[in-house]
Design a protein with these regions (language model features):
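Rossmann-like dinucleotide-binding cores of NAD(P)H-dependent redox enzymes
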Residues: 1-9, 76-77, 82-86, 92-163, ...
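Glycine/serine-rich phosphate-binding loop and adjoining beta1-alpha1 elements at the start
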Residues: 10, 26-29, 33-36, 40-68
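Acidic/polar residues in short coil/turn loops that connect beta-strands
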Residues: 28, 38, 154, 163, ...
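Core beta-strand elements of the Rossmann-like FAD/NAD(P) dinucleotide-binding domain
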Residues: 38-48, 162-171, 209
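Conserved N-terminal Rossmann-fold NAD(P)-binding element of oxidoreductases
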Residues: 51, 88-89
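FAD-site-proximal beta/loop scaffold in flavoenzymes
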Residues: 66-82, 166-223
Length: 223
């Protein structure tokens, strides 16, 4: 990851792209207010503005991110391989992490609320994955409704359910999808609209309700 960041930084310099480290929020007249990482702020204005703040992992109430509870973002920063991992969410990303950590030697449990993992896939395809996971000794718990979690004296985390026995693990990975990250876009004084699911509303050319302001990527609802 660090290598990719350095590579992209070098690429922006070679293309003479100016970048700011901070959080930008859109104001009226295509003005972006930037709260920079060093505590200062600055404003810039563009003839056209593109909103591309992406998405963030969804979380569950009662599972604060930090320490042994992490999302697909934090798990990439692990410096050691956990002995026991519980993955909440049996979708594509959750299954990818399950397979990877099982191959690395972790004891893995997938926790899925639906009747089967990979609920959006053809059952025949999902069954192939289930059989493969059985060979890797990955435990799959479907129809499991998570109730909460608690820290144990030995530092492990116990996950409880409304049905069934608890699961004890060293790391919990939340993998229940992502949501658009429009939280800090500002938008005061603009005609940019956000729908009830958090997506920025755009037309077929990705233009928002504000002229010459566009939104792209995970920030908009795509087929």
């Amino acid at each position: 990851v660090e290598g990719l960041v350095k590579g992209l930084t070098g690429l922006t310099k070679s293309k003479k792209v100016t970048y700011f480290l901070g959080t930008g929020s859109l104001e009226a007249n295509r003005t972006v207010n930037i709260a920079q990482a060093d505590g200062t702020s600055t404003k810039i204005q563009g003839a056209k503005v593109i909103l591309a703040s992406g998405s963030v992992p969804r979380t569950i109430k009662g599972f604060p991110i930090g320490g042994s509870i992490m999302t697909s973002d934090e798990v990439l920063m692990l410096s050691t391989i956990p002995k026991r991992i519980a993955i909440i969410g049996g979708g594509a990303i959750g299954c990818e992490f399950a397979s990877t950590f099982a191959d690395l030697g972790s004891t893995v449990t997938i926790i899925e609320g639906a009747p089967k993992i990979l609920p959006g896939l053809d059952p025949d395809v999902a069954n192939v994955v289930v059989k493969t996971f059985a060979k890797k000794q990955i435990t799959i718990r479907t129809g499991a409704v998570v109730a909460g979690q608690s820290k144990q004296p030995d530092g492990s985390t116990q996950i409880t359910f409304t049905n069934g026995d608890p699961v004890v693990c060293d790391v919990v990975i939340m993998s229940i999808g992502r949501r658009p990250f429009a939280d800090e876009l500002g938008l005061k004084g603009t005609a940019v609209k956000v729908d009830d699911r958090g997506f920025v509303v755009v037309d077929n050319l990705c233009q928002t309700g504000e002229p010459n302001v566009y939104a792209i990527g995970d920030l908009i609802n795509t087929p």
